[in-house]
């Protein structure tokens, strides 16, 4: 499932392609069609991300809530580009682009100003990517859930909004915190490291299109890996811990371990993440 940085990037791309200009809107999913008449001759005012959801606001006060879940995707195509062979939910045509929502099943029509009443949005915690949310805010928020396992809490959008499986694994490795510890057992220093890593890695993932490691380190790893196997993709070098079971930790060379926690794969370094506070 796309995480906060991916939805943030998608919302920015869609906004740049369609906002504040004439559009032709085609609604293809039955749940979307009731607004077809009301959305004639309108423009898109703005497109914003809310955790893993997107809000597309139209000039008549109607707002489209959409959540990609596992298979949905917003794609910006050029005007003459062939569409993907996937289920099309809606198309926003402009003079230069076709913006398509593919395969999503979770959407709703809302009104501007009432978005926070939507059940998903109403339960969101502080947005990690929000520039107004500081590391201190994150520390205070996490401290409200002392009995929660830190790895579980970071996936709970009610606790913090925008983190998913790859970010929680990498955040906890960078912070040198054992993912199975309860929040109440962590020191103030550990909580601050987690909070700072939440901000840093989320922002870096936006800036680097999903790469959580520093760019120079990532590129150096890619070059080294390519010498051993030319078929290795960027996936093998982009993360600190996520999806690297058995691969050496970038810092200490201990093999990364995978366990199942809450039905999800959880990756960590048993050496670095058992270090003292």
Which residue ranges define each predicted feature?
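Gly/Gly-Pro- and Ser/Thr-rich, intrinsically disordered tail segments characteristic of DNA damage-repair
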Residues: 1-110
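Basic, nucleic-acid-binding surfaces and adjacent catalytic neighborhoods in DNA/RNA-processing proteins
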Residues: 22-36, 48, 144-277
């Amino acid at each position: 499932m796309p995480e906060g940085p991916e939805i943030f990037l998608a919302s920015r791309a869609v906004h740049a392609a369609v906002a504040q200009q004439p559009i032709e809107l085609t609604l293809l999913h039955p749940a979307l069609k009731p607004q077809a008449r009301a959305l004639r001759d309108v423009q898109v005012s703005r497109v914003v991300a809310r955790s893993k959801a997107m809000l597309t606001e139209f000039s008549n006060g109607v707002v489209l809530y959409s959540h990609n879940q596992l298979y949905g995707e917003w794609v910006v195509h050029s005007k003459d580009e062939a569409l993907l062979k996937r289920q099309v939910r809606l198309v926003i045509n402009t003079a230069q682009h076709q913006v398509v929502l593919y395969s999503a099943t979770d959407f709703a029509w809302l009104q501007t100003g009432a978005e926070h009443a939507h059940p998903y949005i109403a339960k969101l915690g502080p947005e990690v990517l929000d520039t107004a949310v500081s590391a201190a805010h994150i520390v205070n928020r996490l401290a409200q859930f002392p009995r929660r396992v830190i790895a579980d809490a970071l996936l709970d959008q009610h606790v913090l909004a925008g983190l998913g499986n790859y970010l929680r694994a990498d955040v906890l490795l960078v912070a040198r915190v054992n993912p199975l510890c309860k929040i109440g057992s962590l020191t103030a220093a550990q909580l601050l490291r987690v909070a700072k890593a939440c901000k840093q890695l989320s922002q870096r993932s936006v800036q680097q299109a999903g790469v959580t490691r520093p760019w120079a380190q990532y590129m150096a790893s890619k070059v080294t890996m390519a010498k051993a196997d030319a078929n290795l993709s960027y996936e093998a070098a982009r993360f600190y811990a996520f999806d690297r079971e058995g691969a050496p930790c970038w810092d200490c060379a201990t093999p990364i371990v995978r366990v199942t926690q809450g039905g999800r794969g959880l990756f960590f370094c048993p050496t670095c993440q058992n270090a003292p506070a």
